Amino acid sequence: MSGPHPSVAAARNAVRALLAELEPARGVLVACSGGADSLALAAATAFVAPRAGRAAGAVVVDHALQAGSAEVAARAADQCRGLGLEARVVRVDVDIALGGPEGAARAARYAALEAASREAGDAVVLLGHTLDDQAETVLLRLARGSGARSLAGMPRRRGVFARPFLHLERARLREVVDAVGLTPWEDPTNAVDGPARRADGGPLPRSAIRGRVLPALTEALGPGVPASLARSADLLREDADALDAFAADLLSTARGEDGSLDVEILAAAPPAVRRRALRRAALDAGSPAGDLAHVHVEALDALVTGYHGQAGVDLPGGRRAVRACGRLTL
């Protein structure tokens, strides 16, 4: 008797490895859009989780941004139930004025998934992001001038979220759904000429990278480009983790009992470590991470290394940094 299709086996092994990292009694929820990647994840989880003694279910988020979205969500939930997963649909309201259509939909989706995790007893939410998604993320952030932490791409685990498929190609997951007889939904917003557009009429950034940039790079450099970009993300994540640890040590050394920072200690540190420490200090002081930009960190750094009596620095969240008597107070 032959075994499962090689791609089915690879998907199951990826989920099995992820589940082995979790606390023994912790359940999992598959975030399923109805697309090929998340349906493959649902199929692999439905097979592996019961055999690992774990409760497993599925959550389908309906963003209600496209005509027929309720039907798409219902069909995805039905396919999850057919695999043996208890599934439910959660409809969210997306304010596209907040961060554009992609960002607003993402924020609403993750908030709904976090709520579903809490309702399921802090279940881990499994996301179907692939090696190709990781490559697209690296390119997108590189084009925006991001630093090492952002270029490290999507982490395998963060908070309640986990991504077991980050080292599997999208094409292999398409083979999974074909092999197990599932019918994926083709999201029109993923297409370069899809209905969702930027304000200037151009394609959404990720759609452009998926449909134009990565294919052009692959044609010019060969088929290994996505894997190479994903590998770069892994290497950068190790570097970023080390720099973050050094920055935490620097903050601990520089911080006084009143919370102010010793400027001399900060100035003696390598710039990459010092700027990370200053960013962390601003976050600790209450500046929202999403609003704290490179320009703010540069201004804080100037208070340390280029001080000539200038005024303090206004930070997001109504915070302010000032230098006095060799100390930096946020």
UniProtKB/Swiss-Prot annotation:
GO terms for biological process: tRNA modification. It catalyses: cytidine(34) in tRNA(Ile2) + L-lysine + ATP = lysidine(34) in tRNA(Ile2) + AMP + diphosphate + H(+). Gene3D superfamilies: 1.20.59.20, HUPs. ATP binds at S33, G34, G35, A36, D37, S38. It comes from the Bacteria. Its EC number is 6.3.4.19. InterPro entries: Rossmann-like_a/b/a_fold, TilS/TtcA_N, tRNA_Ile_lys_synt, tRNA_Ile_lys_synt_N, tRNA_Ile_lys_synt_subst-bd. GO terms for molecular function: ATP binding; tRNA(Ile)-lysidine synthase activity. Keywords: ATP-binding, Cytoplasm, Ligase, Nucleotide-binding, tRNA processing. GO terms for cellular component: cytoplasm. Pfam families: ATP_bind_3, TilS. It is found in: Cytoplasm. Belongs to the tRNA(Ile)-lysidine synthase family. The N-terminal region contains the highly conserved SGGXDS motif, predicted to be a P-loop motif involved in ATP binding. This is tRNA(Ile)-lysidine synthase. The lineage of its organism: Bacteria, Bacillati, Actinomycetota, Actinomycetes, Micrococcales. The gene is tilS.
